[in-house]
Amino acid sequence: MGGGNLHSLPPENASVSASYAVTVGNTKLSDAPVLFFVYCHKAFRAQLVELRRFATDAAEADSFSGDLAVELSRKFEFLKLVYKYHSAAEDEVIFLALDKRVKNIVSNYSLEHAGTDDLFTSIFHWLHVLEEEIGSRSDVLREVILCIGTIQSSICQHMLKEERQVFPLLIEKFSFREQASLVWQFICSVPVMVLEDFLPWMISHLSHEEKIEVENCIKDVAPNEDSLQQVISSWLLDDSQSSCGTPTEIMKGVQYVNVSKSLKKSPESHPSSGCFQRFWEWSKKSLSIPNVGRSPIHGLRLFQNAIEKDLRDIQEGLCQAKFQTLILDLDVLMARLNFLADVLVSYSNAFKKFFHPVLEEMTARRSSTAKQFNIDDCLENFQRLLYKSADDKTKTDNFLLQLQEELESLIIQVTKQFAIQRTEVFPIISKNCNHEMQKQLLYTSIHVLPLGLLKCVILWFSAHLSEEESQSILHFLSLEDSSPKKSFPRLLLQWLRFGYSGKTSVERFWKQLDVMFKVRCSCQKEHTEEASGSFSNQTQLQLCKVSKDVYPRKKDKSSTCFMSMDLAVGDMYETPYSSRMNQQMTFSGKLKPPLHLPDFFGEKNMDDPMIMDVKPIDLLFFFHKAMKMDLDYLVCGSTRLAADFRFLAEFQQRFHMIKFLYQIHSDAEDEIAFPALEAKGQLKNISHSFSIDHELETKHFDKVSFILNEMSELNMLVSTINTTAADHDRKMKYERLCLSLREICKSMHKLLSEHIQHEETELWGLFRNCFSIEEQEKIIGCMLGRISGEILQDMIPWLMESLTSDEQLAAMSLWRQATRKTMFVEWLTEWYNGHVLQEEAGEANNDPFGDSDPLEIVWKYLFEASADGEKGSMRSSLLKLPKTNFTGIMNQPPPNYKVEVGKKEEKDLERSESKKICRGSNQEGDKEQTDKMSQKVSQFGPSKKYEQLLTMSEEELVVVIKKISCDSSLDPQKKDYIKQNLLMSRWNISQRTYNLEPSSLSSNMETVHGQHPSYRDPHSLIFGCNHYKRNCKLLAPCCDKLFTCIRCHDEEADHSVDRKQITKMMCMKCLLIQPIGANCSNTSCKSSMGKYFCKICKLYDDERKIYHCPYCNLCRVGKGLGIDYFHCMKCNACMSRTLVEHVCREKCLEDNCPICHEYIFTSSSPVKALPCGHLMHSTCFQEYTCSHYTCPVCSKSLGDMQVYFKMLDALLAEEKMPDEYSNKTQVILCNDCGRKGNAPYHWLYHKCTTCGSYNSRLL
């Protein structure tokens, strides 16, 4: 109901599900551990397909209820969670490592990660509407399915791009050990509660063979520590029940605890895993268990004391760090601060997820203490300041003072929070929860920490415990039996014992932390200095170097990567974690520094290009604005099509224009703008991601074209069939096509909008800052030089329609500036004036009959087609004409304009007969009069038959107009049209008679010189001349003569004709002189004057491929700009696309040939471009090079003359100079390299000592 199956789309080149296998080649996971993330991609794809099928099946079965909406919402919650951790791992682990080796690759992918939150927000909104049963359920279901499709297309395209570009580079640039360390760092950076659900969920979507590969991969990348390996195996191999839920349970929907209805009103307190539900259910059962020993919640007091003590120690250390003697300890202090910030963030999360809802339940929401737990704002500000510590330059006295102030503020907030918890929270929990429930609460809270951070916390915490306190914690962990698996508690117990044993001192612990955070800082600094051109990249290799350089591993890559004998259990290098990854998850990217947008934006709106100094490259982003508006049009138009199929033709026409213009823009960026940007040294690879976007987005356009074609065919069928069962089926198919179209248009809107936004964010400033004004003009000129005049006639109005008046002025100013050395303004003026006149004429005419002759319409209505029942009855009463067929009149041969004209008595006779017919007199002779009139009409032609309208009196006109008004066969628009043209018929006939006067006079002499056909091939009777094949002649206004073409005129006359002044032509079939046009205006002729017609150049041709260049403002022979030619804006010349790389010389065509002195710009002869940049005719070049090898203008060599120069060397070697000249030298200037030098004396040949050329002259 309302959902329906989406219509089948055109087949792809390769299935998306198998794309990962194609993009990364035949590499196996056992050879490249980093492909673990590609297997995650496969799980995401499978999950999205499953969710889409779930929604569509429920919609088709009309079984979509509020409960199903809740279930689907929970599935998407889990998908959002694991995808965000996956994205954070790529941003903060994979991408940073890759950017260390290959610059400018990953920044765009990080931007794409940031755009996924909006996708999930939209689907959650519509699922909530569906759950609350707001509005029409069918409409909401459609929106849900559309949102799922948008999420699917966006995420899948992003993953496909990564598989095509990022992962092949990771495999190429990183060794097996380095890849393994990156995968393990990701696993150690994910909270345990998420990891326990994520790994079983992931492998549940893989085949049996792939599942085994993933299991072996994770075991290989993990350290060879028995307890840790057992934990990993328990997460992977048990597919019946994990500690935090099975994959099956997850996909059925993670059931949050139904503690009270109030929890639903506080979604921020909901965990994203099933741990919370099982904790609560277990804790309810454990209330009856008696309390034994000390309260487990006392351990949190110890934990808080350790945090406060370390914060105070660091505060004292910072006070001493401003002295130069202790500045070396600052790095260790900063590492300790980063670690404690991570601990506080995890501690705060645990309270929000577990302690907060428990406390609210116990106090029946009467306590306000729960709301005082949040110190996120303070932590966020503090961690943002810690980011500045990555650059050593910021560690000045001012920075230290600011850090001390923030730390003091943090200590105050933390102390207050801990005090509230000790006095209000812990007593309530101790009073209302038995020891077993407290143990479960603490144990479950541990799962909030990532595995790597958890180990660091246990080692750090154990160093702060006394012997009695340590024994208490050890006893707590040894008695832990709430979990169905014992491996994880045993691992925690092992880590705690190691820390308590003292094998890892506090000093060593802090040094190891210092190494982890110091590597990050140095990488960030190096990246800032070396790759400042990329906005959002920050690089690090946290573990790769450390693990490779410090700790040896087995050489066999298929074996375990770590050797337990070489690594102590307590070393943190075993379990590295990325604190940035969890910070990104916790604070949703708020800690990241803002993108390095171009300086010209300042504090103003970056969407408004008029706030800045406009530069040539901004023309691209004016185009972006127009494209974004058209994307909105596609979304709105696809929605409208479901209700109005008549809108299909307009939508299809607009879509094809958008597709065509987008393809032109994308090709220009890929082939011109992006290569120019990457040619800058430090910006290599920065645009490849956008080129992949262009390729993939083309497929979306093709899908829309495919659907629109099917809708067009279906629309014709629907419109011609009555309401039947077949018609109903077609209607349902049309609705499904509309839904598919809406989905793709929404996906395109999302993908292209983000693509454009990322281009502007990442590349706009680079184009503006890295290129000078001249270089930007060259880039824009190269892009515009590929666009033909016909496309510009569509593009310019389309672009101007989307811009404000100020933006229009700016855009056209940039356009004119980039083309200032060409004739573009002249072409624009001529085209625009004609375009406006044509539009005004069209608006004024508003012809409901199309382009038909208005007099012909009136004539046919009054005097012809009497076989028509309704119209014939009216005409019989008006004109008393019998039912005579005049349909063959317009097909008669062209009349002979030299006879039957000028005979006054016959004209008078015809007029009198017409009057009698119109007045209805002499009814008995109607047939004879009609036959006689038809004969006269066939002799006089169309222009004379209309003169019968001149004989109608005013009374007759009134009668005719009343009858027209009563004619039910005409719609109101046609009635007004016929009445208006009937009233204007006298003026129209007089004007037409005046225009035809020169060709209508009867004379044995030609009225206009040349008013006769001319033939290109007299034997085959092919019209034209030696220059062109065409069916018309041009009337030269300068001498009032007809010539076949302008070149014929210039050859015969002693002057040149101005093509702009030519306004009339003569059709060589009917010899009618008429205004310039593509076809003959004679209604009995209407012949085409030529396959090619240029209104600007007044050029007709019927055999060659010709195009009008808007920058030359001339017609050129060729297929067109962007096909086989382009226009160089500096040279102001159309050149073959093979000459993209050439020597530019300003307006080189606007000169005479140096040999024959003909003006090259308007010459029709082929032109040869010389290496020096000068031009000459090809025929002149062939003749000239028979005796010369230097340019006649600049004297440079016309080519590679090394063979000739070697011949001269051999010739001079055989010559013997007289003794008096043997030691003499001459000063020469080389014409090729332009350098001066000394050459041995010779009467003719002088060799340049620099380049070896003999093309030189004496000074």
Curated annotation (Swiss-Prot):
List of residues binding Zn(2+) 3: 1067, 1070, 1080, 1085
Q: Where are the zinc fingers (CHY-type)?
A: 1018-1087
Q: Look up the record and name the pathway of this protein.
A: Protein modification; protein ubiquitination
Where, by residue number, does Zn(2+) 2 bind? 1038-1039, 1049, 1055
Sorted alphabetically, which Pfam families does this protein's record hold?
A: Hemerythrin (PF01814), zf-CHY (PF05495), zf-RING_2 (PF13639), zinc_ribbon_6 (PF14599)
- The record lists Zn(2+) 4 as bound by 1094, 1097, 1108, 1115
Residues that bind Zn(2+) 5:
1109, 1112, 1127, 1134
Which compartments does it reside in? Membrane; Nucleus
* Molecular function GO terms recorded: ligase activity; ubiquitin protein ligase activity; zinc ion binding
Q: Name one GO biological process term.
A: regulation of iron ion transport
The residues that cross the membrane are 441-461
Residues at site: Required for iron-dependent instability? 90
**Source organism superkingdom:** Eukaryota
Q: What InterPro entries does its record include?
A: Hemerythrin-like, RCHY1_zinc-ribbon, Znf_CHY, Znf_CHY_sf, Znf_CTCHY, Znf_CTCHY_sf, Znf_RING, Znf_RING/FYVE/PHD
List of residues binding Zn(2+) 1:
1025, 1027, 1045, 1048
Q: Which residues bind Zn(2+) 6?
A: 1128, 1131, 1142, 1144
Keyword Membrane present in the record's keywords: the answer is: yes
Q: Return the Gene3D superfamilies for the record.
A: 2.20.28.10, nmb1532 protein domain like, Zinc/RING finger domain, C3HC4 (zinc finger)
Biased-composition ranges, Basic and acidic residues, are 904-916, 924-934
Does the keyword field hold Transmembrane?
yes
The record's subunit annotation is:
Binds zinc and iron ions.
Q: What is this protein called?
A: Zinc finger protein BRUTUS-like At1g74770
What is the native source organism of this protein?
Arabidopsis thaliana (Mouse-ear cress)
